[in-house]
């Protein structure tokens, strides 16, 4: 999980979702693409 100021989808399988007020990127194909805004 990477913590970034700016989260962006890195591939077509990445989804940007908001959980408990925190923006996250989850990816079904590449778990390495997981990000959280912080």
From Swiss-Prot:
Could you tell me which InterPro entries the record lists for this protein? Ribosomal_bL36 (IPR000473), Ribosomal_bL36_sp (IPR035977)
Keywords noted in UniProt = Ribonucleoprotein, Ribosomal protein
A Gene Ontology term for the protein's cellular component: cytoplasm
Pfam families, per the entry: Ribosomal_L36
Q: Name one GO molecular function term.
A: structural constituent of ribosome
Q: Its GO biological process terms?
A: translation
Q: Which domain of life is it from?
A: Bacteria
Say which family it is in.
Answer: Belongs to the bacterial ribosomal protein bL36 family.
NCBIfam families found in the cross-reference section? rpmJ_bact
Q: What is this protein called?
A: Large ribosomal subunit protein bL36
- Species source reads Roseiflexus sp. (strain RS-1)
Q: Which gene encodes it?
A: rpmJ
